Amino acid sequence: MMGWKILILNHWKTMTTIDKEELDSLIQSEWSYLESKKSEWSLLEGKQDMEVLEHVLRCILHLDLTPEKPQEFKECVKVQNPDGGWSKESHTDKTSMWITTFVGLKLCRGNLILKDSDIQATVDKTLEYVLSMQEEDGHWSDPEWSHLDTTCSVTCFLTIYQVTQDKTDDERINKARIKGFDFITQWQRDSGLWKDDTFHP
């Protein structure tokens, strides 16, 4: 019986081992597939689901393709809502806090490379919107997500904003971020997990 276990374990190790060349090839293949579906995520191709787009922007960032694809970031500026946020669907004006923080986060990171003044103004406008929407107990809300999940995304955005904008000493942002962290901490269960009745991260 022990022999079979060793054989299976060795087979599993062989199956899960992948070298850098294979991994790079796999990543390139996946990116090529995404590129072939550009009409389904790029604002250059029309109206889009901003949740899908922000995930693709993360891929662009991770693959170091930002200098080659600046317009994918710049197009987000054009669909920002007047309040400083973004909607789930680019062609609507119902701002989603969850989407706003993730799009804002990608623009913060992308603009470290692009250094575009319009993107910078957009990110700054996003910050003002986010700060204005914090509730008294420290949370942020989004009708499609729990307060816990939304507040996690906002505190992440605020942290990235402070680091990328050299604003770690900004007391206004620090106060909001820490208040958000305190809200998150209060939701932790005795088991160590975070859980609420709306969504289970």
Predicted segments with their positions:
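An alpha-helical repeat/solenoid feature that recognizes helix-turn-helix modules
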Residues: M1-E21, L43-Q71, K88-K125, E136-I178, ...
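Short, conserved catalytic or adaptor-binding loops enriched in Gly and charged residues
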Residues: D19, L23-L26, E35, K78, ...
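Serine-hydrolase catalytic machinery in alpha/beta-hydrolase-like enzymes
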Residues: G85
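Intrinsically disordered, low-complexity polar segments enriched in Ser/Thr/Pro and acidic
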Residues: S25-K47
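Buried hydrophobic core positions in alpha-solenoid tandem helical repeats
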Residues: E30, L34, C76-V77, V130, ...
